[in-house]
Protein backbone atom coordinates (compact mmCIF):
# COMPACT_ATOMS: atom_id res chain seq x y z
CA UNK A 1 0.00 0.00 0.00
CA UNK A 2 1.66 3.20 -1.18
CA UNK A 3 -0.42 6.01 0.35
CA UNK A 4 1.82 8.71 -1.13
CA UNK A 5 1.30 7.32 -4.66
CA UNK A 6 -2.46 6.99 -4.11
CA UNK A 7 -2.80 10.58 -2.86
CA UNK A 8 -0.47 11.90 -5.60
CA UNK A 9 -2.72 10.33 -8.21
CA UNK A 10 -5.89 11.78 -6.63
CA UNK A 11 -4.42 15.29 -6.19
CA UNK A 12 -3.01 15.26 -9.76
CA UNK A 13 -6.47 14.39 -11.13
CA UNK A 14 -7.98 17.30 -9.17
CA UNK A 15 -5.24 19.69 -10.38
CA UNK A 16 -5.83 18.69 -14.01
CA UNK A 17 -9.60 19.09 -13.54
CA UNK A 18 -8.87 22.58 -12.16
CA UNK A 19 -7.01 23.49 -15.37
CA UNK A 20 -3.43 22.36 -14.66
CA UNK A 21 -1.34 20.78 -17.47
CA UNK A 22 -1.38 16.96 -17.65
CA UNK A 23 2.27 16.70 -16.53
CA UNK A 24 1.75 18.72 -13.33
CA UNK A 25 3.26 17.42 -10.09
CA UNK A 26 1.11 17.09 -6.97
CA UNK A 27 4.23 17.07 -4.73
CA UNK A 28 2.58 14.97 -2.02
CA UNK A 29 4.84 14.51 1.03
CA UNK A 30 4.51 12.95 4.46
CA UNK A 31 3.77 15.80 6.88
CA UNK A 32 6.55 16.69 9.30
CA UNK A 33 4.11 17.65 12.08
CA UNK A 34 0.76 16.14 13.10
CA UNK A 35 -0.91 19.58 13.06
CA UNK A 36 -0.40 19.64 9.27
CA UNK A 37 -2.18 16.30 8.81
CA UNK A 38 -0.67 13.01 7.68
CA UNK A 39 0.24 14.21 4.18
CA UNK A 40 0.73 17.56 2.49
CA UNK A 41 0.26 18.40 -1.20
CA UNK A 42 2.62 21.25 -2.11
CA UNK A 43 2.26 21.33 -5.91
CA UNK A 44 -0.37 24.10 -6.06
CA UNK A 45 2.15 26.97 -5.86
CA UNK A 46 4.13 25.91 -8.95
CA UNK A 47 0.96 25.19 -10.96
CA UNK A 48 -0.72 28.47 -9.92
CA UNK A 49 2.33 30.38 -11.19
CA UNK A 50 2.05 28.65 -14.60
CA UNK A 51 -1.71 29.37 -14.76
CA UNK A 52 -1.36 32.97 -13.53
CA UNK A 53 -3.69 32.29 -10.59
CA UNK A 54 -3.53 33.05 -6.88
CA UNK A 55 -2.25 29.83 -5.19
CA UNK A 56 -4.94 29.99 -2.50
CA UNK A 57 -7.67 30.31 -5.12
CA UNK A 58 -6.33 27.29 -7.04
CA UNK A 59 -5.98 25.31 -3.78
CA UNK A 60 -9.66 25.97 -2.97
CA UNK A 61 -10.67 24.77 -6.44
CA UNK A 62 -8.49 21.64 -6.11
CA UNK A 63 -9.99 20.79 -2.70
CA UNK A 64 -13.51 21.12 -4.20
CA UNK A 65 -12.56 18.64 -6.94
CA UNK A 66 -10.48 16.31 -4.74
CA UNK A 67 -12.32 13.06 -4.09
CA UNK A 68 -10.86 11.38 -1.01
CA UNK A 69 -14.13 9.86 0.19
CA UNK A 70 -13.42 7.15 2.74
CA UNK A 71 -9.66 7.90 2.64
CA UNK A 72 -9.41 11.30 4.37
CA UNK A 73 -11.41 12.54 7.33
CA UNK A 74 -10.42 16.17 6.74
CA UNK A 75 -8.71 18.32 4.09
CA UNK A 76 -7.42 21.80 4.99
CA UNK A 77 -5.69 24.61 3.14
CA UNK A 78 -2.77 26.14 5.01
CA UNK A 79 -0.72 29.24 4.25
CA UNK A 80 -0.59 30.38 0.63
CA UNK A 81 -1.88 27.07 -0.79
CA UNK A 82 -0.58 23.98 0.98
CA UNK A 83 -3.19 21.22 1.14
CA UNK A 84 -3.14 19.21 4.38
CA UNK A 85 -4.69 15.74 4.29
CA UNK A 86 -5.81 13.96 7.46
CA UNK A 87 -6.33 10.22 6.91
CA UNK A 88 -9.56 8.57 8.03
CA UNK A 89 -8.88 6.29 11.02
CA UNK A 90 -11.33 3.64 9.84
CA UNK A 91 -9.53 3.51 6.48
CA UNK A 92 -6.12 3.31 8.20
CA UNK A 93 -7.39 0.47 10.43
CA UNK A 94 -8.58 -1.50 7.38
CA UNK A 95 -5.23 -1.06 5.64
CA UNK A 96 -3.35 -2.22 8.75
CA UNK A 97 -5.55 -5.35 8.83
CA UNK A 98 -4.65 -6.00 5.19
CA UNK A 99 -0.89 -5.44 5.73
CA UNK A 100 -0.94 -7.84 8.67
CA UNK A 101 -2.08 -10.83 6.60
CA UNK A 102 -0.99 -9.91 3.04
CA UNK A 103 2.26 -11.20 1.51
CA UNK A 104 5.22 -8.84 1.98
CA UNK A 105 3.33 -6.64 4.48
CA UNK A 106 0.96 -5.54 1.72
CA UNK A 107 3.67 -4.00 -0.46
CA UNK A 108 2.38 -3.68 -4.05
CA UNK A 109 4.00 -6.19 -6.46
CA UNK A 110 6.37 -4.51 -8.94
CA UNK A 111 6.88 -5.11 -12.64
CA UNK A 112 10.04 -7.25 -12.24
CA UNK A 113 13.24 -5.97 -13.82
CA UNK A 114 16.60 -7.67 -14.21
CA UNK A 115 18.92 -5.54 -12.09
CA UNK A 116 22.68 -6.13 -11.91
CA UNK A 117 24.32 -4.92 -8.70
CA UNK A 118 28.12 -4.59 -8.74
CA UNK A 119 29.53 -4.63 -5.21
CA UNK A 120 32.26 -5.82 -2.81
CA UNK A 121 35.02 -6.44 -5.43
CA UNK A 122 37.97 -7.65 -3.31
CA UNK A 123 41.35 -8.50 -4.85
CA UNK A 124 42.78 -11.99 -5.27
CA UNK A 125 45.67 -12.95 -2.95
CA UNK A 126 44.84 -10.12 -0.57
CA UNK A 127 42.75 -10.21 2.58
CA UNK A 128 39.59 -8.14 2.73
CA UNK A 129 40.07 -4.96 4.76
CA UNK A 130 37.81 -2.20 6.09
CA UNK A 131 37.94 -0.48 2.71
CA UNK A 132 35.76 -3.31 1.34
CA UNK A 133 33.15 -2.98 4.08
CA UNK A 134 31.02 -0.14 2.72
CA UNK A 135 30.67 -1.51 -0.82
CA UNK A 136 29.89 -4.98 0.54
CA UNK A 137 27.19 -4.07 3.05
CA UNK A 138 25.58 -1.12 1.22
CA UNK A 139 25.49 -3.16 -2.00
CA UNK A 140 24.00 -6.14 -0.20
CA UNK A 141 21.29 -3.95 1.38
CA UNK A 142 20.37 -2.84 -2.16
CA UNK A 143 20.28 -6.46 -3.35
CA UNK A 144 18.03 -7.52 -0.46
CA UNK A 145 15.70 -4.54 -0.94
CA UNK A 146 15.31 -5.06 -4.70
CA UNK A 147 14.81 -8.82 -4.28
CA UNK A 148 12.14 -8.23 -1.60
CA UNK A 149 10.23 -6.03 -4.06
CA UNK A 150 10.28 -8.88 -6.60
CA UNK A 151 13.05 -7.91 -9.01
CA UNK A 152 15.40 -10.44 -10.58
CA UNK A 153 18.66 -9.34 -8.97
CA UNK A 154 22.04 -10.48 -10.30
CA UNK A 155 24.88 -10.02 -7.81
CA UNK A 156 28.13 -9.17 -9.57
CA UNK A 157 31.26 -9.49 -7.44
CA UNK A 158 33.81 -7.74 -9.71
CA UNK A 159 36.83 -9.47 -8.16
CA UNK A 160 40.31 -8.17 -9.04
CA UNK A 161 41.53 -11.49 -10.45
CA UNK A 162 43.67 -10.37 -13.39
CA UNK A 163 46.75 -8.27 -14.06
CA UNK A 164 50.53 -8.32 -14.24
CA UNK A 165 50.88 -9.12 -10.52
CA UNK A 166 49.67 -12.68 -11.18
CA UNK A 167 52.95 -13.68 -12.80
CA UNK A 168 54.67 -12.81 -9.52
CA UNK A 169 52.01 -14.60 -7.44
CA UNK A 170 52.08 -17.78 -9.56
CA UNK A 171 55.88 -17.87 -9.42
CA UNK A 172 55.79 -17.49 -5.63
CA UNK A 173 53.09 -20.15 -5.18
CA UNK A 174 55.23 -22.49 -7.31
CA UNK A 175 58.29 -21.69 -5.14
CA UNK A 176 56.32 -22.54 -1.98
CA UNK A 177 55.04 -25.80 -3.45
CA UNK A 178 58.58 -26.78 -4.44
CA UNK A 179 59.59 -26.10 -0.83
CA UNK A 180 56.60 -28.20 0.41
CA UNK A 181 55.12 -25.11 2.05
CA UNK A 182 51.78 -25.25 0.23
CA UNK A 183 49.98 -26.60 3.30
CA UNK A 184 49.95 -23.07 4.69
CA UNK A 185 46.88 -22.74 2.44
CA UNK A 186 47.61 -19.05 2.03
CA UNK A 187 46.16 -18.61 5.52
CA UNK A 188 47.67 -15.16 5.64
CA UNK A 189 47.12 -13.78 2.16
CA UNK A 190 48.55 -10.41 3.12
CA UNK A 191 51.83 -12.04 4.17
CA UNK A 192 51.85 -14.20 1.02
CA UNK A 193 51.47 -11.13 -1.19
CA UNK A 194 54.16 -9.17 0.69
CA UNK A 195 56.65 -12.04 0.49
CA UNK A 196 55.97 -12.53 -3.22
CA UNK A 197 56.59 -8.81 -3.82
CA UNK A 198 59.78 -8.87 -1.73
CA UNK A 199 61.13 -11.88 -3.66
CA UNK A 200 60.20 -10.21 -6.95
CA UNK A 201 62.10 -7.04 -6.00
CA UNK A 202 65.20 -8.86 -4.70
CA UNK A 203 65.61 -11.92 -6.96
CA UNK A 204 66.18 -11.13 -10.65
CA UNK A 205 65.81 -14.76 -11.75
CA UNK A 206 62.46 -14.97 -9.93
CA UNK A 207 61.36 -11.67 -11.53
CA UNK A 208 62.19 -12.97 -15.03
CA UNK A 209 60.16 -16.13 -14.39
CA UNK A 210 57.29 -14.02 -13.03
CA UNK A 211 57.24 -11.82 -16.14
CA UNK A 212 57.28 -14.90 -18.37
CA UNK A 213 54.32 -16.30 -16.44
CA UNK A 214 52.30 -13.12 -17.09
CA UNK A 215 52.65 -13.69 -20.84
CA UNK A 216 51.88 -17.41 -20.49
CA UNK A 217 48.83 -16.77 -18.33
CA UNK A 218 47.47 -14.21 -20.76
CA UNK A 219 47.99 -16.57 -23.70
CA UNK A 220 46.06 -19.37 -21.92
CA UNK A 221 48.92 -21.64 -20.75
CA UNK A 222 47.28 -24.57 -18.90
CA UNK A 223 49.79 -24.76 -16.01
CA UNK A 224 49.57 -21.02 -15.31
CA UNK A 225 45.76 -21.14 -15.52
CA UNK A 226 45.70 -23.94 -12.91
CA UNK A 227 47.95 -22.01 -10.52
CA UNK A 228 45.91 -18.84 -11.09
CA UNK A 229 42.65 -20.72 -10.40
CA UNK A 230 44.13 -22.06 -7.15
CA UNK A 231 44.92 -18.51 -6.00
CA UNK A 232 41.40 -17.34 -6.87
CA UNK A 233 39.73 -20.30 -5.12
CA UNK A 234 41.76 -19.94 -1.91
CA UNK A 235 41.07 -16.19 -1.79
CA UNK A 236 37.34 -16.53 -2.40
CA UNK A 237 37.03 -19.32 0.18
CA UNK A 238 38.50 -16.93 2.75
CA UNK A 239 36.29 -14.08 1.55
CA UNK A 240 33.25 -16.35 1.91
CA UNK A 241 34.01 -16.66 5.62
CA UNK A 242 33.82 -12.84 5.86
CA UNK A 243 30.60 -12.71 3.80
CA UNK A 244 28.95 -15.34 6.00
CA UNK A 245 29.99 -13.55 9.18
CA UNK A 246 28.60 -10.29 7.78
CA UNK A 247 25.32 -12.00 6.85
CA UNK A 248 25.89 -10.92 3.25
CA UNK A 249 24.21 -12.88 0.43
CA UNK A 250 27.29 -13.17 -1.86
CA UNK A 251 28.56 -16.66 -2.75
CA UNK A 252 31.19 -18.09 -5.12
CA UNK A 253 28.49 -18.22 -7.83
CA UNK A 254 28.36 -14.41 -7.85
CA UNK A 255 32.04 -13.95 -8.76
CA UNK A 256 32.36 -12.10 -12.07
CA UNK A 257 36.01 -11.14 -11.98
CA UNK A 258 37.96 -8.94 -14.36
CA UNK A 259 39.18 -12.08 -16.18
CA UNK A 260 35.62 -12.77 -17.39
CA UNK A 261 35.94 -9.93 -19.91
CA UNK A 262 39.42 -10.73 -21.30
CA UNK A 263 38.21 -12.24 -24.57
CA UNK A 264 36.05 -9.17 -25.26
CA UNK A 265 38.84 -6.58 -25.00
CA UNK A 266 40.51 -6.95 -28.45
CA UNK A 267 37.07 -6.92 -30.12
CA UNK A 268 36.04 -3.77 -28.25
CA UNK A 269 39.22 -1.90 -29.21
CA UNK A 270 38.77 -2.95 -32.86
CA UNK A 271 35.08 -1.97 -32.80
CA UNK A 272 35.75 1.45 -31.26
CA UNK A 273 38.36 2.07 -33.97
CA UNK A 274 35.94 0.95 -36.69
CA UNK A 275 33.29 3.32 -35.34
CA UNK A 276 35.75 6.21 -35.45
CA UNK A 277 35.63 6.65 -31.68
CA UNK A 278 39.18 5.42 -30.97
CA UNK A 279 42.38 6.57 -32.67
CA UNK A 280 46.08 5.74 -32.50
CA UNK A 281 48.14 8.23 -30.51
CA UNK A 282 51.86 7.72 -29.84
CA UNK A 283 51.43 3.96 -30.20
CA UNK A 284 48.48 3.75 -27.78
CA UNK A 285 44.77 3.56 -28.65
CA UNK A 286 42.82 6.52 -27.27
CA UNK A 287 39.21 7.76 -27.19
CA UNK A 288 38.96 11.57 -27.03
CA UNK A 289 35.89 12.80 -25.16
CA UNK A 290 34.50 16.29 -25.77
CA UNK A 291 32.50 15.92 -22.55
CA UNK A 292 35.73 16.02 -20.50
CA UNK A 293 38.38 18.68 -20.98
CA UNK A 294 42.01 18.69 -19.87
CA UNK A 295 43.60 21.73 -18.21
CA UNK A 296 44.22 23.27 -21.64
CA UNK A 297 40.53 23.02 -22.52
CA UNK A 298 41.10 20.22 -25.03
CA UNK A 299 39.06 16.99 -25.20
CA UNK A 300 40.41 14.52 -22.66
CA UNK A 301 42.03 11.38 -23.99
CA UNK A 302 41.05 8.07 -22.40
CA UNK A 303 43.55 5.30 -23.15
CA UNK A 304 41.93 1.92 -23.85
CA UNK A 305 45.07 0.07 -25.02
CA UNK A 306 48.68 0.85 -24.10
CA UNK A 307 51.45 0.84 -26.68
CA UNK A 308 52.72 -2.49 -25.29
CA UNK A 309 49.31 -3.99 -26.13
CA UNK A 310 48.06 -4.10 -22.53
CA UNK A 311 44.52 -3.07 -21.63
CA UNK A 312 43.36 -0.75 -18.86
CA UNK A 313 40.62 -0.75 -16.22
CA UNK A 314 38.55 1.51 -18.50
CA UNK A 315 38.60 -1.11 -21.27
CA UNK A 316 37.45 -3.76 -18.80
CA UNK A 317 34.68 -1.49 -17.50
CA UNK A 318 33.44 -0.87 -21.04
CA UNK A 319 33.36 -4.63 -21.66
CA UNK A 320 31.72 -5.18 -18.30
CA UNK A 321 28.78 -2.83 -19.03
CA UNK A 322 28.36 -4.36 -22.51
CA UNK A 323 28.33 -7.89 -21.06
CA UNK A 324 25.80 -6.98 -18.38
CA UNK A 325 23.40 -5.61 -20.95
CA UNK A 326 23.91 -8.06 -23.82
CA UNK A 327 24.55 -11.32 -21.93
CA UNK A 328 22.84 -10.82 -18.57
CA UNK A 329 19.91 -8.88 -20.04
CA UNK A 330 20.09 -6.05 -17.51
CA UNK A 331 17.31 -3.45 -17.37
CA UNK A 332 19.26 -1.44 -14.79
CA UNK A 333 22.89 -1.63 -13.60
CA UNK A 334 24.03 -0.34 -10.20
CA UNK A 335 27.65 0.11 -9.13
CA UNK A 336 28.55 0.38 -5.43
CA UNK A 337 32.04 1.80 -5.81
CA UNK A 338 33.64 4.60 -3.81
CA UNK A 339 33.34 8.21 -4.92
CA UNK A 340 37.00 8.46 -5.99
CA UNK A 341 36.19 6.27 -9.02
CA UNK A 342 33.38 8.53 -10.26
CA UNK A 343 35.14 10.26 -13.15
CA UNK A 344 36.72 7.00 -14.30
CA UNK A 345 33.28 5.33 -14.45
CA UNK A 346 31.63 8.31 -16.13
CA UNK A 347 34.29 8.29 -18.87
CA UNK A 348 33.88 4.54 -19.43
CA UNK A 349 30.09 4.90 -19.60
CA UNK A 350 30.32 7.87 -21.99
CA UNK A 351 32.24 5.57 -24.36
CA UNK A 352 29.71 2.77 -23.76
CA UNK A 353 26.82 5.07 -24.75
CA UNK A 354 28.63 6.53 -27.80
CA UNK A 355 29.43 3.01 -29.04
CA UNK A 356 25.81 1.92 -28.56
CA UNK A 357 26.75 -0.96 -26.24
CA UNK A 358 24.08 -0.06 -23.66
CA UNK A 359 21.00 1.97 -24.71
CA UNK A 360 20.00 5.12 -22.80
CA UNK A 361 16.86 3.28 -21.64
CA UNK A 362 19.05 1.11 -19.38
CA UNK A 363 20.31 3.23 -16.46
CA UNK A 364 23.97 2.94 -15.44
CA UNK A 365 24.02 4.25 -11.87
CA UNK A 366 27.07 4.95 -9.73
CA UNK A 367 25.81 4.67 -6.15
CA UNK A 368 29.01 6.09 -4.75
CA UNK A 369 29.96 6.30 -1.11
CA UNK A 370 32.40 8.22 1.08
CA UNK A 371 35.22 6.96 3.25
CA UNK A 372 35.27 5.34 6.68
CA UNK A 373 37.27 7.59 9.00
CA UNK A 374 38.75 7.19 12.47
CA UNK A 375 37.86 9.51 15.36
CA UNK A 376 40.72 11.78 14.22
CA UNK A 377 38.89 12.38 10.92
CA UNK A 378 41.59 10.52 8.94
CA UNK A 379 41.17 7.21 7.04
CA UNK A 380 40.54 4.39 9.53
CA UNK A 381 43.85 2.59 10.29
CA UNK A 382 45.50 0.39 12.90
CA UNK A 383 47.50 2.12 15.64
CA UNK A 384 50.67 1.43 13.68
CA UNK A 385 49.14 3.09 10.60
CA UNK A 386 48.40 -0.16 8.75
CA UNK A 387 45.22 -1.27 7.00
CA UNK A 388 42.62 -2.79 9.33
CA UNK A 389 41.78 -6.35 8.27
CA UNK A 390 38.05 -6.97 8.05
CA UNK A 391 38.35 -10.19 10.09
CA UNK A 392 40.10 -8.30 12.92
CA UNK A 393 37.40 -5.62 12.91
CA UNK A 394 34.61 -8.22 13.14
CA UNK A 395 36.46 -10.09 15.91
CA UNK A 396 36.67 -6.89 17.94
CA UNK A 397 32.99 -6.10 17.30
CA UNK A 398 31.92 -9.49 18.65
CA UNK A 399 34.29 -9.21 21.62
CA UNK A 400 32.94 -5.78 22.59
CA UNK A 401 29.32 -6.91 22.12
CA UNK A 402 30.10 -9.96 24.27
CA UNK A 403 31.03 -7.80 27.25
CA UNK A 404 27.88 -5.72 26.81
CA UNK A 405 25.43 -8.63 26.42
CA UNK A 406 26.93 -11.13 28.89
CA UNK A 407 26.82 -8.50 31.63
CA UNK A 408 23.08 -7.96 31.13
CA UNK A 409 22.18 -11.65 30.63
CA UNK A 410 24.08 -13.74 33.20
CA UNK A 411 21.47 -16.55 33.03
CA UNK A 412 21.11 -16.84 29.25
CA UNK A 413 22.02 -20.34 27.87
CA UNK A 414 25.48 -20.38 26.24
CA UNK A 415 24.27 -21.19 22.69
CA UNK A 416 21.67 -18.42 22.71
CA UNK A 417 24.14 -15.99 24.27
CA UNK A 418 26.66 -16.69 21.49
CA UNK A 419 24.02 -16.11 18.82
CA UNK A 420 22.83 -12.84 20.41
CA UNK A 421 26.40 -11.55 20.85
CA UNK A 422 27.21 -12.29 17.22
CA UNK A 423 24.00 -10.65 15.93
CA UNK A 424 24.58 -7.53 18.04
CA UNK A 425 28.32 -7.20 17.32
CA UNK A 426 28.11 -7.68 13.55
CA UNK A 427 24.83 -5.77 13.39
CA UNK A 428 26.41 -2.80 15.19
CA UNK A 429 29.21 -2.49 12.61
CA UNK A 430 26.81 -2.78 9.67
CA UNK A 431 24.08 -0.50 11.03
CA UNK A 432 26.57 2.23 11.99
CA UNK A 433 27.53 2.39 8.31
CA UNK A 434 24.08 1.87 6.77
CA UNK A 435 22.43 4.50 8.98
CA UNK A 436 24.65 7.27 7.54
CA UNK A 437 24.04 8.82 4.14
CA UNK A 438 26.31 6.76 1.86
CA UNK A 439 27.55 9.81 -0.05
CA UNK A 440 29.35 11.24 2.99
CA UNK A 441 32.41 10.10 4.92
CA UNK A 442 31.57 8.74 8.36
CA UNK A 443 33.42 8.46 11.66
CA UNK A 444 33.87 4.91 12.97
CA UNK A 445 33.22 4.99 16.72
CA UNK A 446 32.82 1.82 18.83
CA UNK A 447 31.05 3.59 21.70
CA UNK A 448 28.40 5.13 19.46
CA UNK A 449 27.71 2.01 17.42
CA UNK A 450 27.28 -0.25 20.47
CA UNK A 451 25.12 2.22 22.43
CA UNK A 452 21.78 0.86 23.62
CA UNK A 453 20.08 4.16 22.86
CA UNK A 454 19.93 6.27 19.71
CA UNK A 455 19.83 5.09 16.10
CA UNK A 456 22.03 2.00 16.57
CA UNK A 457 21.72 -1.73 15.87
CA UNK A 458 21.62 -2.69 19.57
CA UNK A 459 18.76 -0.22 20.15
CA UNK A 460 16.84 -1.46 17.11
CA UNK A 461 17.40 -5.12 18.01
CA UNK A 462 16.28 -4.39 21.58
CA UNK A 463 13.21 -2.52 20.27
CA UNK A 464 12.24 -5.66 18.33
CA UNK A 465 12.66 -7.93 21.38
CA UNK A 466 10.50 -5.52 23.38
CA UNK A 467 7.65 -5.86 20.89
CA UNK A 468 7.80 -9.67 20.64
CA UNK A 469 7.98 -9.97 24.43
CA UNK A 470 4.40 -8.64 24.54
CA UNK A 471 3.23 -11.79 22.76
CA UNK A 472 5.35 -14.07 24.94
CA UNK A 473 3.80 -12.53 28.05
CA UNK A 474 0.27 -12.61 26.63
CA UNK A 475 0.60 -16.17 25.33
CA UNK A 476 -1.25 -15.22 22.14
CA UNK A 477 -0.54 -15.71 18.46
CA UNK A 478 -1.85 -13.99 15.35
CA UNK A 479 -4.60 -16.54 14.66
CA UNK A 480 -6.32 -15.70 17.97
CA UNK A 481 -6.74 -12.02 17.02
CA UNK A 482 -10.16 -12.26 15.36
CA UNK A 483 -11.87 -8.98 16.27
CA UNK A 484 -11.71 -6.00 13.82
CA UNK A 485 -9.04 -3.38 14.43
CA UNK A 486 -10.22 -0.05 15.83
CA UNK A 487 -8.17 3.11 16.33
CA UNK A 488 -9.30 5.35 19.19
CA UNK A 489 -6.13 7.11 20.39
CA UNK A 490 -3.78 9.57 18.66
CA UNK A 491 -0.75 7.40 19.48
CA UNK A 492 -2.41 4.38 17.88
CA UNK A 493 -3.17 6.44 14.77
CA UNK A 494 0.40 7.78 14.57
CA UNK A 495 1.88 4.26 14.85
CA UNK A 496 -0.62 2.76 12.38
CA UNK A 497 -0.02 5.47 9.77
CA UNK A 498 3.76 5.10 10.06
CA UNK A 499 3.45 1.33 9.65
CA UNK A 500 1.53 1.88 6.41
CA UNK A 501 4.39 4.03 5.07
CA UNK A 502 6.73 1.03 4.82
CA UNK A 503 6.10 0.69 1.07
CA UNK A 504 6.90 4.36 0.43
CA UNK A 505 10.17 3.97 2.32
CA UNK A 506 11.30 0.73 0.70
CA UNK A 507 10.41 2.10 -2.76
CA UNK A 508 12.61 5.16 -2.10
CA UNK A 509 15.48 2.96 -0.87
CA UNK A 510 15.21 0.77 -3.98
CA UNK A 511 15.15 3.77 -6.31
CA UNK A 512 17.93 5.81 -4.69
CA UNK A 513 20.09 3.12 -3.06
CA UNK A 514 19.82 4.89 0.31
CA UNK A 515 19.65 2.39 3.19
CA UNK A 516 19.94 5.22 5.74
CA UNK A 517 16.35 6.16 4.80
CA UNK A 518 15.22 2.70 5.97
CA UNK A 519 17.27 3.07 9.18
CA UNK A 520 15.65 6.44 9.94
CA UNK A 521 12.20 5.00 9.30
CA UNK A 522 12.76 1.99 11.58
CA UNK A 523 14.20 4.19 14.32
CA UNK A 524 11.17 6.48 14.07
CA UNK A 525 8.85 3.46 14.11
CA UNK A 526 10.55 2.09 17.25
CA UNK A 527 10.08 5.48 18.94
CA UNK A 528 6.38 5.61 18.01
CA UNK A 529 5.88 2.09 19.35
CA UNK A 530 7.65 3.02 22.58
CA UNK A 531 5.31 6.00 23.06
CA UNK A 532 2.26 3.86 22.21
CA UNK A 533 3.43 1.10 24.60
CA UNK A 534 3.92 3.55 27.47
CA UNK A 535 0.61 5.39 27.08
CA UNK A 536 -1.80 2.75 25.73
CA UNK A 537 -2.50 -0.32 27.85
CA UNK A 538 -2.16 -3.40 25.65
CA UNK A 539 -2.73 -6.53 27.73
CA UNK A 540 -4.88 -4.71 30.30
CA UNK A 541 -6.89 -2.64 27.79
CA UNK A 542 -10.43 -1.58 28.77
CA UNK A 543 -12.10 -3.96 26.30
CA UNK A 544 -11.25 -7.13 24.38
CA UNK A 545 -11.71 -5.25 21.08
CA UNK A 546 -9.13 -2.60 22.06
CA UNK A 547 -6.80 -5.26 23.50
CA UNK A 548 -6.84 -7.21 20.23
CA UNK A 549 -6.50 -4.01 18.16
CA UNK A 550 -3.41 -3.00 20.10
CA UNK A 551 -1.96 -6.49 19.84
CA UNK A 552 -2.47 -6.28 16.06
CA UNK A 553 -0.59 -2.97 15.95
CA UNK A 554 2.20 -4.57 18.00
CA UNK A 555 2.23 -7.59 15.67
CA UNK A 556 2.57 -5.43 12.53
CA UNK A 557 5.28 -3.38 14.27
CA UNK A 558 7.27 -6.57 14.99
CA UNK A 559 6.86 -7.80 11.41
CA UNK A 560 7.85 -4.42 9.94
CA UNK A 561 10.91 -4.00 12.18
CA UNK A 562 12.06 -7.54 11.36
CA UNK A 563 11.48 -7.15 7.62
CA UNK A 564 13.06 -3.70 7.51
CA UNK A 565 16.15 -4.88 9.39
CA UNK A 566 16.33 -7.93 7.11
CA UNK A 567 16.52 -5.68 4.02
CA UNK A 568 19.61 -4.17 5.70
CA UNK A 569 21.08 -7.59 6.48
CA UNK A 570 20.70 -7.01 10.24
CA UNK A 571 19.68 -10.08 12.24
CA UNK A 572 17.02 -9.85 14.94
CA UNK A 573 16.98 -11.83 18.19
CA UNK A 574 14.04 -12.87 20.37
CA UNK A 575 15.69 -11.92 23.68
CA UNK A 576 18.52 -9.57 24.55
Curated annotation (Swiss-Prot):
Location in or out of the cell: Cytoplasm
Motif ('HIGH' region): 122-132
EC number in record: 6.1.1.19
Family annotation (InterPro entries): aa-tRNA-synth_I_CS, Arg-tRNA-ligase, Arg-tRNA-synth_N, Arg-tRNA-synth_N_sf, ArgRS_core, DALR_anticod-bd, Rossmann-like_a/b/a_fold, tRNAsynth_Ia_anticodon-bd
Secretion signal span: none
Broad class of the protein's primary localization: cytoplasm
UniProt KW keywords: Aminoacyl-tRNA synthetase, ATP-binding, Cytoplasm, Ligase, Nucleotide-binding, Protein biosynthesis
Any single GO BP term: arginyl-tRNA aminoacylation
Catalytic activity: tRNA(Arg) + L-arginine + ATP = L-arginyl-tRNA(Arg) + AMP + diphosphate
Gene3D superfamilies: Arginyl tRNA synthetase N-terminal domain, HUPs, Isoleucyl-tRNA Synthetase, Domain 1
GO terms assigned for molecular function: arginine-tRNA ligase activity; ATP binding
Cited SUPFAM superfamilies: Anticodon-binding domain of a subclass of class I aminoacyl-tRNA synthetases (SSF47323), Arginyl-tRNA synthetase (ArgRS), N-terminal 'additional' domain (SSF55190), Nucleotidylyl transferase (SSF52374)
Taxonomy, superkingdom: Bacteria
A Gene Ontology term for the protein's cellular component: cytoplasm
Family of this protein: Belongs to the class-I aminoacyl-tRNA synthetase family.
UniProt subunit comment: Monomer.
Protein name according to UniProt: Arginine--tRNA ligase
Lineage: Bacteria, Pseudomonadati, Pseudomonadota, Gammaproteobacteria, Enterobacterales
Amino acid sequence: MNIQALLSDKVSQALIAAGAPADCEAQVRQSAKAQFGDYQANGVMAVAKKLGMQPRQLAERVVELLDLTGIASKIEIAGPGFINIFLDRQWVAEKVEYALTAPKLGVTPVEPQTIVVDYSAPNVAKQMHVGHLRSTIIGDAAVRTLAFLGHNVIRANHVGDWGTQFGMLIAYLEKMQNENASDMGLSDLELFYQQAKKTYDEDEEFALRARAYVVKLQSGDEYCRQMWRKLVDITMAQNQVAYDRLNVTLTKDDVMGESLYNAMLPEIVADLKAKGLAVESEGATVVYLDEYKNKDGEPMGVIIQKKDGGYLYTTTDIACAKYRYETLGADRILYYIDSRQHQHLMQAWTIVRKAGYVPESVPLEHHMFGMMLGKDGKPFKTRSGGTVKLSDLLDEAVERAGKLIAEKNPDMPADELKQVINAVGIGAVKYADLSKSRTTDYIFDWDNMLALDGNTAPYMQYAYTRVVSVFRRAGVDESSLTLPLVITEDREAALATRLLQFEEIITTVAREGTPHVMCSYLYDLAGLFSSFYEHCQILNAESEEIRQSRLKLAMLTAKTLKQGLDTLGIQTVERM
